[in-house]
């Protein structure tokens, strides 16, 4: 009778081990994926900081070039594009300064618009993080809308070097 019972239990240990290993592996992969998500959050924070910093010292017409600069691109998370990073110039009230048609304005009008800029904001727009297939039940098909990230800094030179009497190269616009 004892032999009969023992023969029915052969292989049970390997089945239990397989189930436990499977559960542990799913847990480890889930923890790694959540860690990758949190790392992407930090990368986006750093990306907006770098982009805002560059925008404070680059000329206003370079605002569409900043998201493609190497300093910013190196911090892109997976599936991020330059269109997801928006650079905006703000007046003293925090309202966006409209720069459309800036190059077609007269020098006086350009100076007037330029003088309104007090802050620079870099923000993430419409970026969705994609989880790997293991966590694809999170969000919509594994896509999760990222929280709003933005960095606002006071405007500095905005790419314009002030003229000095002892330097012939000063008073020019520096292209980033």
Regions found by a protein language model. Give the residues of each.
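Alpha-helical assembly-interface signal, strongest on the long, hydrophobic N-terminal helix that forms
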Residues: 2-73
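Short, conserved structural patches
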Residues: 54-176
